[in-house]
Amino acid sequence: MRATVGLVEAIGIRELRQHASRYLARVEAGEELGVTNKGRLVARLIPVQAAERSREALIESGVLIPARRPQNLLDVTAEPARGRKRTLSDVLNEMRDEQ
């Protein structure tokens, strides 16, 4: 079953299952498709962005090695530079207190 949801063509799960390669080729060419289950939109098939493809290519070629344990950079805490006892945050806080 095909329908249009908003500006996106929507296809039923059965239709997708029977013709997956046809629909994936359309998505790879840049088209967006919606997937419905019993007439209700449940998923969107969107093309992978060029930046994501580049990253994957770099990983496959061994140039880029992804983190083993990725972290949120906001959770990383600053450590004092070698040989120093104060962090940059400490210095900035002191400068603010002097003003």
Curated annotation (Swiss-Prot):
Q: Which GO terms describe its biological process?
A: positive regulation of growth
Pfam families according to UniProt: PhdYeFM_antitox (PF02604)
Checking SUPFAM superfamilies in the record gives:
YefM-like
Keywords on record? Toxin-antitoxin system
- Which InterPro entries does this entry report, sorted A to Z? Antitoxin_Phd/YefM (IPR006442), phD-YefM_TA_antitoxins (IPR051416), YefM-like_sf (IPR036165)
Q: Signal sequence: where?
A: none
The similarity annotation says: Belongs to the phD/YefM antitoxin family.
Biological role stated in the UniProt entry: Antitoxin component of a type II toxin-antitoxin (TA) system. Upon expression in M.smegmatis neutralizes the effect of cognate toxin VapC47.
NCBIfam families the record matches: phd_fam
Task: Name it.
Answer: Antitoxin VapB47
Its organism's taxonomic lineage begins at: Bacteria, Bacillati, Actinomycetota, Actinomycetes, Mycobacteriales
Designated gene of the protein: vapB47
